[in-house]
């Protein structure tokens, strides 16, 4: 067994050290299991793998609650073993996505800031309690009086709330995670109504909690050594389209500063997950903007590049999700990066209250947008789940400025990312200020629906599809008598229908 004695500072806790197999045996059919992790960072690995192995001879089903997406040791292993009955609140795993879209796993797509409190409120489907929390740690501290402090690793996610709410806690002490991570975290769980108070954070750099998750030792059912690394993913190359979107964003920001709608160092930035979002942030590295602040959920390569360039003052998030190369860079210089980074529970990092208070600039990606400014972030052709809404809604409705990015084309030009009407709506026209593509910037603030349509078709849509979109809009205006939001109901989803039938949205 892996030696974790130097990581466990509480002598009484050492008596609870056991194998992954013994810990997995504690999990029973029908349980609600809350795990640490947010993106493939800071999630338990040994116990889920042992549970998947056990299920080969002892089948069972669990309801799996996470922070967001997690690594393959959970989502692939448990899905392929038939263990997952229900899953929430976000995922990016191919095996799990297939199971969701064929109906074998029931999936609840939630705003990420809502998850922990919904569990505490008893709003979840079926049985409401967290039966067992499985949390990855780099250190277990002795707080005295039968209390320990769980020092998380590369993410916070919902760990603080899971530990507080769970009947039992399993801790995986991962020796591949550096002990130097201690001090980066800020664990805080808000009170629930009717006793809720304002979250006492007014700047991205504020610390309002503890550097560990407090836990009663009597709750800890098992402590499991682990030496499996985070399965972080490589990000896509920054292509010409991504560079163009980044340049368009920087030009827009410069105009906003010139018009005195933004300060010279902008406002706290929030950026979604993925290659496009990372590429857009990377566009700021070579810009003139300095003394930037970040209040986001996921800290990707672009954020580290801003730190390295001396342009970032503080970076607040709930998870580190760098590429493998960037993770190595971080691990070799943890002490320096710690000066800039704060990891918080997603209930705080994604808090709508805080997004509005500090004036976040929300920047997220879209699968498609329609001519009136509605955004689809989650479904292909309105039916097949891609990933989930994630934290985009937490920030979009409550930020100072809300920006969505999309390339004008997808699938080699077979799909227009601008359509007459979104096949699924995650963010309504009321929540969208600006849409950016490689072609330009559509500033929708203060415009009527018909004005928005003209700007989006002109600035965002690809010339290949502009004639079709203009034709639809003009005929809709005539057919509806120039009404507030013109649509031809029999044709509103015609682009999608044509793609499903012919493989292209072109006529």
Task: Give a label for each model feature.
Residues 2-507:
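Conserved alpha/beta enzyme-core scaffold
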């Amino acid at each position: 067994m892996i030696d974790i004695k130097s990581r466990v500072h509480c002598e009484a806790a050492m008596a609870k050290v056991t194998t992954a197999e013994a810990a997995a045996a504690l999990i029973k059919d029908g349980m609600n299991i809350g795990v640490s992790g947010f993106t493939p960072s800071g999630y338990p690995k040994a116990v889920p793998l042992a549970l998947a192995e056990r299920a080969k001879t002892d089948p069972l089903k669990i309801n799996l609650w996470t922070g967001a997406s997690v690594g393959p040791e959970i989502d692939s292993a448990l899905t392929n073993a038939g263990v997952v009955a229900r899953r929430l609140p976000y995922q990016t795993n191919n095996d799990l996505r297939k199971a969701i879209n064929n109906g074998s796993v029931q999936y609840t797509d939630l705003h990420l800031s809502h998850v922990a409190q919904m569990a505490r409120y008893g709003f979840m489907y079926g049985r409401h309690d967290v039966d067992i929390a499985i949390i990855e740690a780099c250190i277990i501290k002795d707080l005295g009086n039968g209390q320990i402090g769980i020092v998380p690793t590369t993410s916070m996610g919902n760990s603080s709330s899971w530990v507080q709410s769970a009947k039992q806690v399993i801790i995986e002490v991962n020796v591949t995670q550096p002990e130097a991570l201690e001090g980066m975290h800020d664990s805080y769980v808000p009170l629930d109504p009717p006793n809720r108070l304002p979250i006492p954070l007014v700047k991205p750099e504020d610390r309002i909690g503890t550097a560990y998750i407090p836990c009663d030792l009597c709750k800890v059912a098992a402590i499991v050594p682990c030496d499996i690394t985070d399965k972080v993913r490589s990000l896509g190359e920054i292509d010409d389209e991504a560079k163009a979107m980044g340049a368009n964003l920087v030009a827009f920001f410069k105009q906003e500063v010139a018009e005195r709608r933004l300060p010279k160092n902008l406002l706290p930035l929030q950026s979604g997950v993925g290659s496009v979002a990372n590429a857009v942030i990377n566009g700021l590295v070579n810009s003139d903007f300095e003394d930037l602040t970040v209040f986001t959920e996921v800290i990707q390569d672009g954020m580290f590049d801003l730190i390295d360039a001396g342009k970032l003052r503080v970076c607040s998030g709930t998870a580190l999700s760098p590429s493998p190369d960037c993770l190595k860079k971080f691990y070799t210089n943890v002490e320096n990066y710690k000066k800039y980074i704060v990891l918080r529970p997603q209930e705080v990092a994604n808090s709508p209250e805080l997004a509005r208070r500090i004036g976040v600039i929300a920047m997220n990606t879209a699968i498609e947008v329609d001519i009136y400014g509605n955004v689809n972030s989650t479904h292909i052709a309105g039916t097949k789940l891609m990933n989930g809404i994630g934290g985009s809604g937490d920030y979009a409705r409550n930020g100072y400025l809300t920006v969505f990015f999309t390339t004008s084309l997808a699938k080699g030009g077979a799909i227009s990312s601008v359509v007459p009407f979104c096949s699924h709506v995650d963010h309504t026209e009321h929540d969208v200020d600006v849409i950016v593509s490689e072609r330009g910037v559509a500033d929708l603030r203060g415009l009527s629906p018909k004005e928005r349509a003209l700007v989006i078709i002109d600035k965002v849509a690809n010339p290949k599809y502009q004639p079709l979109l203009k034709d639809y809009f003009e005929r809709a205006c005539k057919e509806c008598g120039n009404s507030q939001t013109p649509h031809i109901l029999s044709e509103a989803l015609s682009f999608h229908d044509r793609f499903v039938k012919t493989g292209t949205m072109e006529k």
